[in-house]
Amino acid sequence: MPQASALSTHLAERLRATPRDASLAILFPGQGSHQVGAGRDLFDAFPLAREVFERADQVLRFPLTKLCFEGPDEELRDTANAQPAILTASLACLAAALENGALRRQPAFMAGHSLGEFTALVAAGALSLEDAVSLVATRGRLMQEASERQPGTMAAIIGLNGEALDEVYRGSGVELCNYNSPSQVVVGGPVAAVEEASRLAKER
């Protein structure tokens, strides 16, 4: 791996240098939140955001930035590429917000939705950008390989809870994956089982 730069330390230190705001939190997104072209305006406008993308390219030893900005979309959506792309674009957003003064107070909390937890760790100074990019790329590759061996999918179920929810997924091969909110859960499993669970949920 290339020698670590001071970029991630610089981002965390700039955050810590701002006044702490107990009412402020940052939540970083997970997989599924990316599209071709996302972050290009930040890359063009803010040197610190550009450095985030360029550093990710160096760590991965392939032009992630070009894939993010030009696609093709199908290749970007592969889990092996989508995960480092989302991490990088999210950190570029943070860098731009610090550089242009939009983020002037230190959040009391930083968190992430699934993959976004890695971004939060970098923002908090607990993990370097380089290590995060490397870990997330490996994570994405392993998840991609697993999904190719045994195809699966996920679905959000809205408005069901308690016994009604139990009846949708119990014994079906579908598992509860995330509690997004009191009224929304995510289920996952084999494609056919998730499709059947989604059908049952729509009937309720």
Name each region found by the language model:
Residues 31-33, 60, 123-204:
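Alpha/beta catalytic cores of group-transfer enzymes, especially the acyltransferase/condensing modules
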Residues 51, 85, 114-115, 127, ...:
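An amphipathic alpha-helix/helix-turn recognition signal
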Residues 83, 116, 190:
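Short, conserved glycine- and acidic-residue-centered signature motifs
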Residues 90, 108-116, 120, 128:
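Gly/Ala-rich beta-loop-alpha elbow adjacent to hydrolase catalytic centers
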Residues 93, 117-118, 141-142:
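A short acidic, glycine/proline-enriched capping/turn motif at secondary-structure boundaries
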Residues 96, 100, 121-126:
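Alpha-helix C-terminal capping segments
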Residues 2, 8-111, 187:
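Helix-rich "cap/lid" substructures immediately adjacent to catalytic or cofactor-binding pockets
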Residues 73-74, 109-115, 140, 152-156:
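Short, glycine/charge-rich beta-strand/loop segments that flank catalytic centers
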